[in-house]
Amino acid sequence: MPAGMSGAAGKTLANFKAPYPEPTSQQRRYVIFLDPKGYRKELNDYKVELIPGRVEKVDGANVYRMGGSIEERTIDGWGYTYYVVTLTTMSGTLMMPLGDAALKRPRFVAMSTNNLYRYNSQLPIVVYTPKDGELRYRIWTVKSTGSGTAKSINAREM
């Protein structure tokens, strides 16, 4: 299956009949459909990390982060949540790059975020980013040993 696709890939936002706002001319809308894991497992053992960012030309020596925020909003009368991302400036460490590391190449620069969101296969995760932004996400799961693992996935624009 291609990256970003899942067993829930046959779903569309129209299946939910909820009036999610259309993206503005300055936005992209990403919709994430999650595979069912069972109610208790979804509630206790799975979380979703949203990783918004932007592709920027950066060197290979420094660590870069994008500033910004993720605002949670609710569709009035429905109770369904969606998220609006604001991206601001990029910051990085100040190491002197040498050799190939000095070459600036396009790379995804992620926004700093610590939030984990509920895994709910019954509803899509709808995220609006700036037009020049991208969205990636990770599914975090708990193993019986108590340690967590994550799988990184590119979100699909819809």
From Swiss-Prot:
<dbReference type="Pfam" id="PF03974">
    <property type="entry name" value="Ecotin"/>
</dbReference>
<dbReference type="InterPro" id="IPR036198">
    <property type="entry name" value="Ecotin_sf"/>
</dbReference>
<dbReference type="InterPro" id="IPR005658">
    <property type="entry name" value="Prot_inh_ecotin"/>
</dbReference>
<dbReference type="InterPro" id="IPR027438">
    <property type="entry name" value="Ecotin_C"/>
</dbReference>
<comment type="similarity">
    <text>Belongs to the protease inhibitor I11 (ecotin) family.</text>
</comment>
<protein>
    <recommendedName>
        <fullName>Ecotin-like protein 2</fullName>
    </recommendedName>
</protein>
<dbReference type="GO" id="GO:0004867">
    <property type="term" value="F:serine-type endopeptidase inhibitor activity"/>
</dbReference>
